[in-house]
A protein has these predicted regions:
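Intrinsically disordered, low-complexity, compositionally biased regions/tails
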Residues: 21-23, 36, 59-60, 91-94
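A short, exposed loop/beta-hairpin motif centered on an aromatic-Gly-Thr core
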Residues: 25-44
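Generic N-terminal leader/processing signal
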Residues: 2, 7, 39-41, 55-58
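Short N-terminal "domain-start" leader segments
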Residues: 1-21, 71-93
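Amphipathic alpha-helical interaction segments
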Residues: 19, 28, 47-48
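Residue-level detector of alpha-helical secondary structure
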Residues: 43, 47, 51, 58-60, ...
């Protein structure tokens, strides 16, 4: 069973097993959550999603997580373009 340990705006972070789950509460859980290994990474992704930031140091996994979390189509498209430009494009589940 997971336990909510942090919330900022519509994003909740839950402790789950040996990792963390970030959920955009404005989306269905199936389509609006992602898993991360540490709390620091979870908070960074939440802040980036809220501010709609894109960092050059983001990994493919981080970009895919932000794509799943965001409701903002313009931000989602920028993230997808970053994946394509970086040559790290893969199947995206949005």
């Amino acid at each position: 069973m997971s336990r909510k340990i942090f919330q900022r705006k519509e994003y909740s972070i839950y402790r789950a097993g040996d990792g963390f789950i970030i959920h955009n509460t404005n989306k269905k859980f199936e389509n609006g959550h992602t898993h991360v290994n540490n709390f620091y990474k979870a908070k960074i992704l939440v802040i980036m999603a809220i501010k709609r930031e894109i960092d050059d140091k983001l990994s493919k996994r981080d970009i895919e997580s932000l794509i799943r979390l965001t409701n903002d189509n313009r931000y989602r498209n920028k993230l997808i373009n970053k994946l394509e430009r970086s040559g790290i494009n893969g199947e995206i589940d949005s």
